[in-house]
Amino acid sequence: MDYQQILDTINDEMSYRDVTGKVASYIPELAKVDRRKFGMHVYCGDQQHFSFGDSEENFSIQSISKVFTLAMAMRLMGEDLWDRLDVEPSGDPFNSLTQLEYESGIPRNPFINAGALVISDILVDQLEDPKKELLEFVRKITGDDNIHYNETVAASEKSTGYRNIALVNYIKALGNIKCDVEPIVDFYFYQCSLAMSCSQLSKAFMIFANKGRILETDEKILKPKTVKRINALMQTCGFYDEAGEFSFQVGMPGKSGVGGGIVAIHPDNYSVAVWSPILNENGNSELGMKALERFTTLTGVSVF
């Protein structure tokens, strides 16, 4: 398979001029990102790399970070985690308050904001320094100590994060938050501010394509059954209320973020990351969705 030729074809066929969406504006720092940015990186099971465009430029990964924190929480709690979270697609916007009242404070899945905040509560409760340990986890699975939080983005999120603060308070009132609100939202804003490139993300997500092992060293990080559950959740819940569309068009487990990044995996084959900050009405990268659909069409390879 000539992945580089396929990526070059995608790069030639697509442009930011072809999409009509907008860069995220509700977080002030994200609104400053150049809408022309576009990059893609494929990391294969034989350790080959293929890329184009702005694939080495860091951006705010936002909700993609929820996959990392879920993996950490599952290592800590195992199956007991699902006493506090459900595993169903939500069908509502990612920051919705509505479902919580009807479902007694149990978030519909770990990738909507309410679910990710319950995960944050668990990590704040059980880890001595959750910010440090999350960064160490991501650096380890990526093999790159240059990954960092973007302090400016974290502060920008905090300045406008009233709905997330409301979510934590509401879940706490319903009995599914243990810690104080402030450290939970502080950790959450920092995790979303993680700055990574497509190249780094494709390497990090290879553990989900490689049965929980770091490809280069074969070190076991996650149990295979943990990876199976995370991949299933990415397939059904990884794209806000557009998960069905992504499965239909692309056909792989993946996760998006409002920073414009998308990561997807084909188990035992590759991990692919794409970044374009222009979002569609559902908060997913418009050009990224199109690029990944074209990628699986041209390769003829998906999980279906």
UniProtKB/Swiss-Prot annotation:
Keywords linked to the UniProt accession: Hydrolase
Keyword Magnesium: no
Reaction(s) catalysed (UniProt annotation): L-glutamine + H2O = L-glutamate + NH4(+)
Residues annotated for substrate binding in this entry: S63, N113, E157, N164, Y188, Y240, V258
Cited InterPro entries: Beta-lactam/transpept-like (IPR012338), Glutaminase (IPR015868)
Enzyme class: hydrolase
Superkingdom per UniProt: Bacteria
The keyword Acetylation appears for this protein: no
GO process terms (BP): glutamate biosynthetic process; glutamine catabolic process
GO MF entry, a single one: glutaminase activity
Pfam families cross-referenced by the UniProt entry: Glutaminase
EC number of the protein: 3.5.1.2
Cross-referenced NCBIfam families: Gln_ase (TIGR03814), PRK00971.1-2 (NF002133)
Family named by the database record: Belongs to the glutaminase family.
HAMAP family reported in the protein's UniProt record: Glutaminase
Record's subunit section: Homotetramer.
Name this polypeptide is given: Glutaminase
Gene: glsA
